[in-house]
Regions:
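Extracellular/periplasmic catalytic domains that process cell-envelope and extracellular macromolecules
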Residues: 1, 25-26, 125-128
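Short loop/helix-cap segments at secondary-structure boundaries that form the rim of catalytic
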Residues: 1-2, 40-45, 98
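Short, well-ordered secondary-structure micro-motifs within conserved domains or adaptor modules
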Residues: 1-12
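Residue-level marker of intrinsically disordered, low-complexity segments enriched
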Residues: 2-4, 48, 104
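Glycine-centered flexibility motif
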Residues: 7-8, 29, 90, 130
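Generic beta-strand/beta-sheet core signal
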Residues: 7-8, 34, 135
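A glycine-rich, often tryptophan-bearing local segment used as a flexible ligand/cofactor-contacting loop or short
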Residues: 11-86, 158, 162-163
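Catalytic beta-strand/loop cores that center a nucleophilic Ser/Cys/Thr
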Residues: 60-186
């Protein structure tokens, strides 16, 4: 896309702004939204696609499964082979898919589905000449939870395992970090 609009969990947005956002996407823009933007932006701008299921989450971490590893939204970000985790902030909005023909689930979580009734963690759908990407929780804020031995391993060891070479200065900086800390994006 030539232009991307990021809306990270807003409060109320005016009806005029909703129309401008919808027109932006229809003209070929990409809308990237998180969490409460589901109810406040996506539902009014793109009805019948996805919605909040009215069961807000607790503050916890769930295992996720990458469904579309080749999606440009996920390229180089998540490696589905390594038991990735996702932080659900308290009061995050689970995503209910209403139009399964148009909406593609990129990431899902069985744990999220068992606890809150919806498995979708990140979705994308086309609208006009553009598209909308939405994810539960926030893109900038994650937390560490060491759930298994992989998360406790040294970050430099993981980088080496994945074929990422690091110079000695970077390796020294990474020496005290475990993989869980790196994945948490703190």
């Amino acid at each position: 896309p030539e232009q991307v609009l990021v809306v990270n969990c807003p409060g109320n947005v005016s009806p005029a702004a909703i129309v401008r956002i919808r027109d932006f996407v229809a003209a070929g823009g990409t809308l990237f939204t998180t969490d409460w933007a589901l109810r406040n932006i996506v539902e009014p701008a793109f009805p019948g696609t996805i919605e909040y299921n009215d069961r807000s989450t607790g503050d916890e971490v769930v295992r996720i499964e990458v469904v579309e590893a080749d999606s440009p939204y996920l390229a180089g970000v998540l490696d589905g082979e390594n038991d990735p985790q996702w932080w659900l902030e308290g009061s995050s909005y689970p995503i209910r898919v209403l139009d399964a023909e148009q909406v593609r689930v990129l990431i899902r979580s069985r744990e999220l589905g068992e606890r809150y009734g919806e498995e979708a963690v990140a979705v994308v759908f086309p609208y006009g000449k553009g598209e909308v990407f939405h994810m539960i929780s926030h893109y900038y804020l994650q937390r560490t939870e060491l759930r298994n031995a992989r998360h406790e391993q040294a970050a430099v060891s993981y980088a080496s395992e994945k074929g990422v070479s690091v110079d000695s200065e970077t390796a020294e900086m990474m020496a005290d970090l475990n993989l869980g800390d790196v994945e948490s994006a703190e």
